[in-house]
Amino acid sequence: MKQFTALLVLLALISCADDQWDDCVTSTGPNLTVEREASPFHTMELGSKIDVVLTQDSVDAITVEGGRNLLGQVETSISDGVLRINSNLTCNWVRNLHDRIKVHVHCSSLRTIVYTGSGDVTCTNAIVQPTFRVEQRQGSGTLRLNIEADTCWYGLHTGPGNVIASGTANVLYLYSNGYAHIDVLAQQHQQSHCNNSGSGDFRTAPSAVFYGAVYNAGDIHYYGDPIIGSLVDEGSGSVIHGD
């Protein structure tokens, strides 16, 4: 067994590229926070196992927090209004699971998140925009968002990454085709349009009108006493009033 374990370690180290060697054989180092260059952006594309903390602000700014020896493997770039955050770290399994990279993003006009990573996203205050959109594809972390917008779209296409939203909205569009859950009970809204084609559950409490469609194993729980715009129940899941 010891020989097998040693072989796995050796293969992992061999797989590390030259510019990732420190990632595989060195410690994270002391915690450090560094500023990164920033310019205005409207979309954030987040990959890898990186936690992001969002703050609505009048200026755009980015700081990266983590072990000094690993910060060079974290990429933050902005082009054509898109902020891209990724990591080249490959040997996280040899370190303490709590030693995670955190990126603090101050944003003035963020209105779209494209999420393909496994880190978590949180907000220190409300992100205020006319519209806001989340597109999750193979994401596996949790997005805890505080959004104030007229219209919000939460689209979870694949993967188990959940959305838990607070704030306010006039209209919400909820969609899932994966394993994820969507909980918008804390986001006050008037209309809720729900398409659950996945196996996770939705929770929504529109004050005016509810539209619900279930096509798979996931349930839709709706609360309050909204007008029912339409109901479709074609999966093994159900549309449920309350719990």
Please annotate each region the language model reported.
Residues 1-16:
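Sec-dependent bacterial lipoprotein signal peptides
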Residues 16-69, 88-106, 122-123, 237-243:
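Short acidic/polar N-terminal linker immediately downstream of export determinants
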Residues 42-54, 103-105, 110-243:
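Extended, compositionally simple hydrophobic/Ser/Thr-rich segments
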Residues 61, 80-82:
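A generic structural signal for beta-strand entry/edge sites
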Residues 72:
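Active-site-flanking structural segment that lines cofactor/substrate pockets
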Residues 82-88:
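Short carbohydrate-recognition loop motifs
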